[in-house]
UniProtKB/Swiss-Prot annotation:
SUPFAM superfamilies: UROD/MetE-like (SSF51726). Its cofactor is Zn(2+). Binds 1 zinc ion per subunit. One of its GO terms (molecular function) is zinc ion binding. CDD domains: CIMS_C_terminal_like, CIMS_N_terminal_like. This is 5-methyltetrahydropteroyltriglutamate--homocysteine methyltransferase. Catalyzes the transfer of a methyl group from 5-methyltetrahydrofolate to homocysteine resulting in methionine formation. 5-methyltetrahydropteroyltri-L-glutamate binds at residues 16-19, 117, 526-527, 572, 616.
Amino acid sequence: MTITHNLGFPRIGAQRELKRAVEAYWAGKQTADELLATGRALRAAHWRRQADSGLRFVPVGDFAWYDHILEWTTLLGAVPARFAQPETQAVSLDTLFRMGRGRAPSGKPAAACEMTKWFDTNYHYIVPELVPGQTYRIAREDLFEQVREAQALGYAVKPVIPGPLTWLYLGKGDAFQQGASDEDKLKLLANLLPVYQQVLKRLADQGVEWVQIDEPILALDLPAAWRDAFGLAYAQLAGSPVKVLLATYFDGLKDNLSTVTKLPVAGLHVDLVRAPEQLDDVVEALHADQVLSAGVINGRNVWRTDLDQALRKLEPVARQLGDRLWLAPSCSLLHVPVDLLAETELDAELKSWLSFASQKLDELSLLGRALDGDSSQAVQEGLAAQRAALAARRSSPRIHNPAVGRRMAASEQVSRDRAPFAERIRQQQARLNLPPFPTTTIGSFPQTAEIRGLRRDWKSGALSDSTYEALIRKEIEAVIRFQEKVGLDVLVHGEPERNDMVEYFGELLAGFAFTKNGWVQSYGSRCVKPPIIFGDVARPAPMTVGWSSYAQSLTDKPVKGMLTGPVTILQWSFVRDDQPREATCRQLALALRDEVLDLEKAGVKVIQIDEPAIREGLPLRRADWQAYLDWAVDCFRLSTAGVADDTQIHTHMCYSEFNDIIESIAAMDADVITIETSRSNMELLKAFEDFHYPNDIGPGVYDIHSPNVPDVDWMVGLMQKAGANLSKERLWVNPDCGLKTRAWPETEAALISMVQAARTLRQATS
């Protein structure tokens, strides 16, 4: 009988129960015991759902209060010195939260650890901080307690832990200047591996048979030293009394396959959604007693699986491997919403095309039964339902828009060229008259409960359109007056009408669909509800012009029009899988171009097109980068094609480590780029040491993801550090991201300090 299992389940709960509990605890509205009880209840519900679907094992260790990498970092006791962790005491939950967000109900506030994207997904992990000679110990008991929880409920468990090489590769430290693959990090294995051995021994003592060790860096281009380190590390772990399932995902093993096949592990999981072509090579390379876990259900998108195609692919493998073939999703289901049954307002046709985490478990079970030759009525009806849904989707008239097809065919003839930057910036400065070190914010201002209530009441029909518009205009005016009072130079309207920087636009574009409970975790307690792009994209009417032109009418200072860029909308949506992603992105660019030109006609002098996701779209293998960058840059330029030279185009990128793609960033030719640099202490500016970035740049001077108010001198120091590599005439002063998640008191204090920092810089250079 084919074993089915899961690499990980969404931890947030179908109704975001974890988010609400954690935030209530942070706010002092819930005790630690109440928070822990919520965690236990969620884990029990998730294990029950997975077991009910027929999984042989339930995963344990996929639950996290903030982030699974942070959980593992604290288990290892790798707590940075500024958090004052006693060496002999367990790491507390509050210390974990302070590492993630800078503060917690107990303990002194401190600078939060850096946060960055998890491979090429929209999930963020907390970066481990590494120092030479770092020592490790088992400093948290959560993993072992959760194993006991699941066993007490009667489940066979498969603990899931990050692999030692992946954990080190993802870590950073001042001593490791060569980046992720710095070979000096491998010296830490000597202290790290004994703790892994202790963990595996303790799990074995708890009766655990299989442990899943995630090593997703095996989908990357790895230097020889790192490939060699896999052999040394897993040889040392081979003496552990548990069976190891080595899990890889997000791409194929490719040149790392020869490394993996030499490892003394009992099983191997591979992603056959991202890299279906690797199946034959992996099967051929397996040892005679090794298990192959085939990741055939897409863990990163929401479309139903073609089970007939999967069966055709797997049947010869099943005949060859027998019970050594396991089935699983391609990766953790962390990246998809919890349950389609929670969607009561999606139309039946579209809903029939979809599959969320819970439904993917059912698909997995159905596939396993069919592969085992189960010809029962239930299996046959299940397969027939899959076929019918796929056929209906392919033939639906909702998918293709002939007008979009015609625009796509003509888009190659649209000129992307503008005058040289030196000429543009001269015209823009004459029009805008900005001081040195101009100040601005990234776009959003605090989203209060009142603002969220306005949107909710309007959508439910409790507020009329006219009343809603009047109230939103009042919020916009308040934000404009606040910015004038603080002394900012380029203003924003605050985006009170927007629930999310992608969902807002998707609701106004054709080809998009929306869920009510399709939440996925982005970072910590922050969840996002990605739109679903199911068909051709078009803009039926202006989306932002009314709000932006109203905001500009309130002040003589320039107010930025705010748009989300085509690549980011693509990256942060669930994208149709029936055409290349490039084609969908180009459709988005054409729709946004219409909006840009309408904003310009309405008198908006500065237009920001956010592209925070530009780097996360990079393929994991460098050989595939240029093809992606070519179309991503072209789509950005297509979205701004035709604007006047005195209209200033901004773009924003947050948590984008783009040092290695700086030439492509420059090729986007935005007049001003604002980037996240505060958490990384201006590390992202290393790219400018060797590359003379030609246009204006605003390196973020404070971390908006932390509630701590920045110090003026600290921000001045960051800008002086930036000025060592960049022309001071080209520098802007801004936060590193939008202010949506912050409260008003800390926002006001932070922006007052930021404006003072800019004034200090002007005085120092005058």
